[in-house]
């Protein structure tokens, strides 16, 4: 499987501030690559460099196996993209907007606009003014515009940002269809980890401009650990009892009386009995598994995600 995007020590500085710091990413052909990070982690800056919108301070970019800086014009003809919120003429229809874009980029195929509108599910909205579109419809129209020239690579910057649950589900279905049915390689940035979790083949996690990890998602799922979660009236007492009676040391203490126990998974009944007999109220017991979001928070050292 060939490599579609490869960066080597890609760095972008603004004054003394490193927005992207020696970034090395590898995106394989046909994959959906999830580029994950908190807001301000360097995701959009990276995408702008990949699209030639800003120049890196140092480092190399190869796309389709070619040096991006030496073959920028030819490479960009093979890429579709959405960076941040796509802009359109609000007083024109979807078809009229796409017609303008088609003329600008030299697309003359007669049915190109009809085809991309059907791909994104807007074929029945051709007469409605874009100003009356929902945010989800505008995002899909943005993808339609990005598909006009039949790209091999699609780069999407936070395409689910601001969408309601239905819009997110529709966007996820569309992205999956483009990758798996039309063999388009997709590079998608996001901080909405639960959406990426259901979509991607590979994950790259960026924090403060640095790539912390790049891993196939299947491997990441195997790494995520199961645990017993207790919600208790007295965490401190419960921890002492677990250590003394069961020699349990692989656990985490969370807010709201939550303790996650990563060992002794088959002994929840005995643990429950231990707590109750020692005057601890057991409010909840569940068997759960770390999500990608849990792993992400641990990897970046805690804190909020957004």
Swiss-Prot record:
<comment type="similarity">
    <text>Belongs to the ABC transporter superfamily.</text>
</comment>
<feature type="binding site">
    <location>
        <begin position="37"/>
        <end position="44"/>
    </location>
    <ligand>
        <name>ATP</name>
    </ligand>
</feature>
<keyword id="KW-0046">Antibiotic resistance</keyword>
<dbReference type="InterPro" id="IPR003439">
    <property type="entry name" value="ABC_transporter-like_ATP-bd"/>
</dbReference>
<dbReference type="InterPro" id="IPR003593">
    <property type="entry name" value="AAA+_ATPase"/>
</dbReference>
<dbReference type="Pfam" id="PF00005">
    <property type="entry name" value="ABC_tran"/>
</dbReference>
<keyword id="KW-0067">ATP-binding</keyword>
<dbReference type="GO" id="GO:0046677">
    <property type="term" value="P:response to antibiotic"/>
</dbReference>
<feature type="domain" description="ABC transporter">
    <location>
        <begin position="5"/>
        <end position="233"/>
    </location>
</feature>
<dbReference type="GO" id="GO:0016887">
    <property type="term" value="F:ATP hydrolysis activity"/>
</dbReference>
<dbReference type="InterPro" id="IPR017871">
    <property type="entry name" value="ABC_transporter-like_CS"/>
</dbReference>
<protein>
    <recommendedName>
        <fullName>Bacitracin transport ATP-binding protein BcrA</fullName>
    </recommendedName>
</protein>
<dbReference type="GO" id="GO:0005524">
    <property type="term" value="F:ATP binding"/>
</dbReference>
<keyword id="KW-0547">Nucleotide-binding</keyword>
<dbReference type="InterPro" id="IPR027417">
    <property type="entry name" value="P-loop_NTPase"/>
</dbReference>
<comment type="function">
    <text>Part of the binding-protein-dependent transport system for bacitracin that confer resistance to this antibiotic. Probably responsible for energy coupling to the transport system.</text>
</comment>
<keyword id="KW-0813">Transport</keyword>
